[in-house]
Amino acid sequence: MPRRRSAAPPPRRAAPARSASTAAALPPRTMAPPPAPSRVQQAPPPTAVQGGSSPGFFGNLVSTAAGVGIGSAIGHTVGSVITGGFSGSGSNNAPADTSVPQSSYSNSVPEAAYGSAPPSTFASSAISEEAKNACKGDAKMFADCINEHEFSQCSYYLEQLKACQAMWSNQQ
């Protein structure tokens, strides 16, 4: 058996050189575009969600409802704290006194002397207006804090508002 050589392959023959006129006459060679892939890859189908990793539709629904309920309860509580001192509503169930205040002046004074309302009505309305306006700044600062921060961060403003409302309720 003859031995085979494992040396380098024989050199290739060089192509004959073309003259400038022949090179200009031939059109340039174009390469064929690469063949398109025969199989288009598709995304794998979504896998089924294992139990416990996602709460699902009803879990999300219950969670949202709980959040709305808690938010509503906190909002109503804050609203009643802010407006409770001004509207006269509170936890007591005593009926409101709707009687007209009695004037200490005699009825012999003509009504034109003091206007359309007796003097005692002017005094009581001035006090209630003053009470409403006295705590307005505290209520606004508390409301601004609630809008920008957590409820727990606004406890200082809540205490100031409660103190103001208590002070004015004792003076009336």
From Swiss-Prot:
One of its GO terms (cellular component) is mitochondrial intermembrane space. Residues 30-47 have a biased composition (Pro residues). GO terms for biological process: mitochondrion organization. Residues 1-54, 82-111 are annotated as: Disordered. Disulfide bonds: none annotated. Residues 89-109 have a biased composition (Polar residues). InterPro entries: CHCHD2/10-like, Cys_alpha_HP_mot_SF. It comes from the Eukaryota. PANTHER family: COILED-COIL-HELIX-COILED-COIL-HELIX DOMAIN CONTAINING 2, ISOFORM A-RELATED, COILED-COIL-HELIX-COILED-COIL-HELIX DOMAIN CONTAINING 2/NUR77. This is Uncharacterized protein C6C3.02c. It comes from Schizosaccharomyces pombe (strain 972 / ATCC 24843) (Fission yeast).
